[in-house]
């Protein structure tokens, strides 16, 4: 496409010729590469105003403060949940506050013991704990001071006051027989 006009500047005519040739080459390549994915154009990077070091530091501080606040809320939520769990688990009145890992392990044992109780199973304590057949007894070796060490022995949360059992029998040591509960 040539423009020979006295009103059309010469330097634009050659530039337009170059553009026309590029377009033709592009069309030829597109027809040859029609099976290939189209080439993505790079995004333009616009220059943005440079921020001062003080502004950058303030932005970093704000981001860090927000992250710290999120982490603090997460930890408070976790601690509240663990405190609630400690309140549900049976414990001796003079027992010191359990650590997080002790609380989780004891909860695991307590759930397993309640499951055994619901299923009507009452495995022999020595057999279970010697063979480790329940899978949890071996995990409880670090918790020998807790009211129950094996899921083989369910622990009640509380006996109703109508029962004649003294409070000292509410908790059982590792190899004692599990109580039988009355059926309602």
UniProtKB/Swiss-Prot annotation:
Keywords: DNA-binding, Nucleus, Transcription, Transcription regulation. Residues 28-37 have a biased composition (Polar residues). Residues 62-75 are annotated as: Basic motif. It is found in: Nucleus. Its main location: nucleus. InterPro entries: bHLH_dom (IPR011598), bHLH_transcription_factors (IPR050359), HLH_DNA-bd_sf (IPR036638). Pfam families: HLH. GO terms for molecular function: DNA-binding transcription factor activity, RNA polymerase II-specific; E-box binding; protein dimerization activity. Transmembrane segments: none annotated. GO terms for biological process: anatomical structure morphogenesis; axon development; negative regulation of gliogenesis; positive regulation of transcription by RNA polymerase II; sensory organ development. Residues 62-114 form the bHLH domain. Acts as a transcriptional regulator. Regulates expression of various genes, including homeobox protein unc-42 and helix-loop-helix protein hlh-34. Required for embryonic viability, neuromuscular development, organization of the nerve ring and neuronal cell body location. Regulates AIY neuron axon morphology and cell fate. Plays a role in cell autonomously establishing a neuronal left-right asymmetry. Involved in regulating glial specification. Interacts with hlh-2; the interaction is direct. This is Helix-loop-helix protein ngn-1. It comes from Caenorhabditis elegans. The lineage of its organism: Eukaryota, Metazoa, Ecdysozoa, Nematoda, Chromadorea.
